[in-house]
Amino acid sequence: MAPSALLRPLSRLLAPARLPSGPSVRSKFYVREPPNAKPDWLKVGFTLGTTVFLWVYLIKQHNEDILEYKRRNGLE
């Protein structure tokens, strides 16, 4: 196969994109109400509850690890 035949498809890939214009073109995106207008309070509650739970668990685990470290090294 000739090298020019291989370069033809590549030149199409490297060419700048052209956007179709005219009244027949439809947008792929629809204008909708922003998601912040009506928050899903159930998701908000689960998210905040999970966050609080994870922070409490992290701090509790950290304190247990500190006590274990002190016990093993004779610092307590």
Swiss-Prot record:
Q: Where in the cell is it found?
A: Mitochondrion inner membrane
Q: Which GO cellular component terms are attached?
A: mitochondrial inner membrane; respiratory chain complex I
Q: What is its main location?
A: mitochondrion
Top-level taxon of origin? Eukaryota
Q: How does it sit in the membrane?
A: Single-pass membrane protein
Q: Which UniProt keywords apply?
A: Electron transport, Membrane, Mitochondrion, Mitochondrion inner membrane, Respiratory chain, Transit peptide, Transmembrane, Transmembrane helix, Transport
Share what the entry says about its subunit structure, partners included.
Complex I is composed of 45 different subunits.
Q: Which PANTHER family match?
A: NADH DEHYDROGENASE [UBIQUINONE] 1 SUBUNIT C1, MITOCHONDRIAL, NADH-UBIQUINONE OXIDOREDUCTASE KFYI SUBUNIT
- What's the protein name? NADH dehydrogenase [ubiquinone] 1 subunit C1, mitochondrial
Which gene carries the instructions for this protein? NDUFC1
